[in-house]
Amino acid sequence: IKSCLFNEIGGNAIFINGEFIVPATTQNIDVTDCHIGNYGRIFNNSIGILLTHAIDCDLTHNEIHDGYYSGVSVGWNWGYAEHVSCRNNISYNHIYDIGQGWLSDMGGIYTLGVQPNTVISGNVVYNVGCDESAYGYGGWGIYLDEGSSYMIVENNLVYDCSSQTFHQHYGKENIIRNNIFAFGGEG
């Protein structure tokens, strides 16, 4: 999927849904140089790019903005359960004006589950805001949720988020290095 425009979308702009089978059959998919804006206009909990149960995919050089939920979400098994997602690359994306105070428990970039050798690098993420009335949590810039492990998060610029600019719910053996995280609402 290259150089496409997605605008005024009712749900997810791009949904790549693999099966949880070994070996994984959803692999080697590139989403690059796309412009994704104003998604989730009917189903507010929609995502700009949603990638589940996939291997060796590149989500790079995309501009994603003005969604009510997460910009990019990758993974899809809760906790440390066996999982096929690995070696995915989320790099050099420009993600902004996400959440806009509509929902909570989301991020500019969101991951879920064990994902060995997945890389989140060189992204610029800002203006991520959650619904303050929903206990005021979950407007995170980069959000590694339950079990997100064995990943590299490096060289990202993340700022102006209603919660933290980086949040690890629980996980292990992640490498977080050389990022700039600034102006999170909770620290």
Task: Please report, for each region that a protein language model flagged, where it lies by residue.
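Right-handed parallel beta-helix
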Residues: 1-11, 25-40, 55-69, 84-99, ...
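Extracellular beta-strand/beta-solenoid scaffold signature
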Residues: 9-22, 42-51, 68-80, 103-112, ...
